[in-house]
Amino acid sequence: MEQQIHQAVEIAMSGTADPNLKNQAFAFINQIKSTEDGYKSCVDILVKSGAQPVNEGLKFFIFQVVDENIEKLSSEQLYSLNDQLFKTLSSYISNDVSDPIYLRNKFSQLFAKIFCYVYLNIYPNFFKSLFELISSNKQIALDYYTRIVIAIHYEIGDKFIARSRELQDRNNLLKDAIRLNDMNALVSSWGKILQVPSNSSEVLNNQLKIVGQYINWMEIGLFISNDYMRSIFQYLNKEHQRNETCMTLIEIISKKMKPSNKLELVGILDITNIINSIDLSENDDLEFVENIAKLINQVGQELLIVLENEPTLFSSINAQLAKLWPLIFSSLGHEYDDVSQHVFPFIQQYLLLCKKSPELGSLDLLSTLLNKIIIKMKFDDDANGVDDDDETEQFSEIRSKLKNFQDTIAVLKPDLYVEAITIVINESLFGGDKNWRKIELGLFELNNFSESLRNNLINLPKSEITNSKPFQIFQEFLVKLINSDLIINVNHPKIQIGFFDIVVKHYNFLNAQSSQQSLILRILEIFTSPLGLFNENEKVRLRSWYSFFRFVKLTKPSLNNTAFVENVVIKLQPLLVIKAELPTTDEDDDVVENGNFSSQLYLYESIGLLISLLSTDLMNHKIKFIDLVFQPLFNDLENCVSSSEQVKLNQPLISMQAHHCLMALGTFARGYDHDFQNKYSEEIRGKINNAAQVVLITLENFPKNELIRDAARFSFARFIPILKNQINIHLAKFVTLVLAANNLKISELTDFLSFLGQIVHNYKDDDNIYQLLNNLLTPLIKKIFELSSNSGEDALIPDIIRDKYQLKKAYMTFLSAIFLNHSASLFVTETNKQEFAEVVTSLLEYAYDLSETSVSKLAITQLINVVNFFGNGGKIHDPEDKYANNLPPVEGIDAFLMSRVTQLSFELPFQKQEFDLKDAQYRLIGQEISLLLKSYQQRGGDEFLSYLSNYLTNMGLSQSLMNDFGSNLVKLDARNFKKYFITFVTQLKGNK
């Protein structure tokens, strides 16, 4: 069989073997793993492998087979396997068999696994046998020894591996037995290995790792002797062992013990002096410097933990910290952030502890720490500040942590903080240095200063903040910054973006200045200079377009300087030129917009707002400026519209260009409307009317284009606040064009319903709009039903299903808008009354559909509206609906509603298996049903109660329960009946 195993493994690993032969080989291999004969054959091959080498693939397979069978073995078999493994290892050592590392590790894992089964009762001499094997001090023996000991740690001591309670108990017994029988000998053997620096690098690193692993649960006194620690410390000066030595020392210093013992340990180890003896200044091994920083951090954290647990040791701990701080500062100030951030945990813990123990934070120490933090927040000399790479992102994260430290110091020592931050801001921004890194630090700290004032980190009485000296200092800095030539003299993206961000963020500070208007104009001039909106750097340019919009929107400057506004509008003309680009798809097939159009819209909105802010006395100028913006767009649209149908079809860029122009018109109107106190003159409305007409002409010429329909809807929604009732001359045509589109998408109709809901709300008192809605309601509802039906090939596509749910919700929200805006009469006019029954039926259908609970709940909400407005006689109950009195009652609606509402209210919770009131979504539906019943009771009175009584009796409800339900329905208010109904349903379903 051994020969067969050889052949099977060889075939299975072959890249050229026949597939059928390979399948047979795999089948045979699986059989070997699962049979006792196969296991024994593999053990035989393993035992011979010391004298008769086998290839790596076969050996790894044998290790796997043995590993998978250990758990199945009897005590006798375990003893035998343990003996055979030791014989094999002895043979490897005698014959200097040096397998690849992965095989040595796998073999060591076998020893570790069988150790767990034999050490307690079957073979307690396990370690003694290992000691015999390493007595020769051969490197191969020491290598296997250290690997086996490490593997045993992973089996029984690794605290990062989750284990069952049973395994944990077993491991505890194993550790107890080791402590009792072999701990001294083990620790001694490790010390002897460390005393020989000529041992191989792998052996020494493994041995250092072992000390770090086992010290966690062994007697620390065995390790903490001068000779033993000297053996470990020596490797801090050995290039190949120093990193592992740091990790070992971290584990030693981290061992849990009483506070006084831990303080004694820190003193004995004297790690600070050891580190001071190492020359790190010219060390180019960054990993080692990082590990030293980790070690320094751990010593500091351990001292702070001791102080938290035993405050009486303050003097001794403070003395140790005094020795440690120079190393902390050195690591914090290291040129590489990867080193600096390793002492962050200590700094954070220290500052938090200072809040509890103020005596810990001396003024001198915190002053030094704050200065180090500030210096560290500056960009490195080799950073260009332009590239958005991983290093920049990492620096931002580190900066954020440093800022938190700075904020904590501000809380601890407000005067120190204010003094330090004002010095750094003043020197960085106004010291004459044109180094962008220093200036950027000043901007960053100016922003931090304002945040500390806003969050009152310096603990001033709230009523005094705005009159405080720090607040006045900040305002002076801000004004000085705006009036300075700093941003002009230092041409760097970080400075430009930082400046614009600060002035936008702190616009409200400007309002407190007597020179507010001149400051705002100064900022607007900088925005419209080559440093802002026209910046050569695309990132700065696009960011400033948005910042410009935000600034204008937030400050709403009082502008009566027509020359200034005209200059802005004319100057911005080149930036307003729209050049559409077709979108592309990325590697994930997601659509990616090309060009800067979305950012351009901020400019259109800004200009709209600026023009609106001009005094009404300057109407001629306002009209002139609007023409300057609109005319190029009109010309563009005319070119698009005049293209032949074939060209429009073959060149999608034309429709994209038209879309962008329409969006620009709508966005300009939105900007003009930002000043909601504006009273729009007829001249302004005339201009927007022209724009609306152009939108309609464009839509007429692109009737099948979804992009154009979307842009037209967007624009009309923005024209409404300005045109008000004048919109109705365009609205009928617009709605007709949209609904007439034979390729209208579900998502489009969803958005269109939202637009119509806005129309219903804004024009609820307008007779012309009412008539328009009256004429479109039936075709609109038919269109909704057509697109939301579940028939067709696309009915099962997830995206389509989602879109249909959204359409149903939009439809019901639109119905709600009609009810709430006193227009329910629209449902029962001569034009629409035939469709009203379909509307109510659709609501019942949606209510029963629990596949999307939000749709069901919304449908029940609309049924409540139907009951409230049409229940009890079919006459509309809404005194504010001025058309209601002229319309006859809806015949038969009472009987229909009473029957269907009652059925729905009890069939939904009792007959739908998925209806579980423990689920929050179904509970909401249940609560909505209770409101539906309460609404009908209030509207239908005794007639409804009588019908309900008969229905519940037929349902099998006892008379007492029926009486209780009816009584509570009448006497409880809506809120309390909601609770009652949920309890009623829960109890009744629980009794079934």
Swiss-Prot record:
Pfam families registered for this protein in UniProt: Exportin-T, Xpo1
| Gene Ontology BP term (one) | tRNA re-export from nucleus
| Keyword vocabulary terms for this entry | Cytoplasm, Nucleus, RNA-binding, Transport, tRNA processing, tRNA-binding
Note the superkingdom of the native organism. Answer: Eukaryota
- The keyword Transport is annotated on this UniProt entry: yes
Q: Which residues form a coiled coil?
A: none
GO molecular function annotations of the record: small GTPase binding; tRNA binding
One GO CC annotation? cytoplasm
Q: Does the keyword Hydrolase apply?
A: no
- Disulfide bond sites: none
Q: Which InterPro entries match?
A: ARM-like, ARM-type_fold, Exportin-1/Importin-b-like, Exportin-T_C, XPOT
Q: Which family does it belong to?
A: Belongs to the exportin family.
Sum up the protein's function in the record's words: tRNA nucleus export receptor which facilitates tRNA translocation across the nuclear pore complex. Involved in pre-tRNA splicing, probably by affecting the interaction of pre-tRNA with splicing endonuclease.
Instruction: Kindly provide the name given to this protein in its UniProt entry.
Output: Exportin-T
The gene designation is LOS1
